[in-house]
């Protein structure tokens, strides 16, 4: 709601609590995920109506509110923002499936390309949106914003903002900093 009211595009979707009906307008495939938490725990891509109850139950086991969104066939991009300025953009490419917990934390399961192989114009669009998210959330030091870029039309959709992203030497923000010539010691 905050992103939409700030003019930041998000995938079409609805927030549900237990017992709420899923509007038919969502259709399939769709993405079901807890409203809070992280690392894609409790997140499912649902391709058939009969799999929806199980996906909802899994998401509700993580949170009392669940988001059901239209599935968008897209490239996944992420960008850090430090002190209000967007950093290099990374494209995230899981070897299989989507960027779930396993693909995030098991070595070799995901390719992270920095800088992302997108046009200069698209880079600026993603960075500008990330800065707007940073401002809308009134973030202070740093954060990271995840986006989808629709493969059909290039539209950008904000998935989420991470207000305390990982800062290990192999985390995404340090990779962005390295692409800009900043070493890990300077960053931290």
List each language-model region with its residue ranges.
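A short, glycine/Asx- and small/polar-enriched loop/turn
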Residues: 24-27, 83-84, 151-156
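ATP-dependent carboxylate activation and anion-phosphoryl transfer catalytic cores
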Residues: 7, 119-188
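Short small-residue beta-strand/loop micro-motif enriched in glycine and branched aliphatics
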Residues: 40, 111-113, 168-173
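Phosphate-binding site of ATP-dependent enzymes
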Residues: 47-128, 156-157
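Short beta-strand-to-turn element immediately C-terminal to the catalytic PLP-Schiff-base lysine
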Residues: 16, 43-48, 81-83, 150, ...
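Active-site nucleotide/adenylate-binding loops and adjacent lid/helix of ATP-dependent enzymes
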Residues: 1-75
């Amino acid at each position: 709601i905050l992103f939409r009211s700030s003019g930041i595009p998000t995938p079409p979707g609805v927030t549900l609590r237990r017992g709420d009906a899923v509007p038919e307008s969502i259709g399939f495939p769709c993405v079901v995920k807890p409203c809070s938490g992280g690392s894609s725990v409790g997140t499912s891509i649902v391709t058939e109506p009969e799999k929806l109850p199980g996906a909802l139950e899994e998401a509700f086991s993580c949170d009392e509110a669940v988001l059901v969104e239209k599935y968008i066939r897209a490239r996944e991009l992420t960008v850090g923002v430090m002190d209000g300025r967007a950093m290099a953009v990374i494209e995230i490419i899981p070897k299989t499936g989507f960027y779930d917990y396993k693909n995030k934390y098991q070595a070799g399961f995901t390719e992270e390309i920095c800088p992302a192989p997108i046009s200069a114009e698209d880079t600026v669009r993603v960075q500008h949106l990330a800065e707007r998210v940073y401002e809308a959330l009134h973030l202070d030091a740093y954060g990271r914003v995840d986006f989808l870029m629709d493969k059909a039309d290039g539209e950008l959709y904000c998935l989420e903002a991470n207000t305390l992203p990982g800062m290990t030497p192999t985390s995404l923000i340090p990779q962005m900093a390295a692409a800009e010539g900043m070493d890990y010691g300077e960053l931290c």
